[in-house]
Regions:
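Ribonuclease/tRNase effector modules and their secretory precursors
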Residues: 1-78
């Protein structure tokens, strides 16, 4: 899994350290919603059943480099 330096840095935060790489890969492959930001970055969401929360993964425009990943408390599935 390709990542940015920013992601590698934020991954050290306690709330982010518990996010499993398998969950990130799941979101990338099985999003319930996808949005493209004006800067070309791609946001994807999927529910992680183990924690009953929605994980948002932000990818660079290449569609494979992870820039950020966190549980999105405000996400509501359409």
């Amino acid at each position: 899994m390709k990542t940015t330096k920013y992601y590698d840095y934020t991954r050290k935060k306690p709330d982010r350290a518990r996010i499993k790489n398998d969950w990130i890969k799941f979101v990338i492959s099985n999003p319930v919603k996808t949005e493209i930001q004006s800067d070309g970055r791609i946001k994807k969401w999927a529910k992680i059943p183990e924690v009953n929360k929605y994980l948002m993964v932000i990818l660079l425009g290449d569609g494979e480099t992870v820039h950020n990943a966190f549980f999105d408390r405000s996400f509501k599935e359409d």
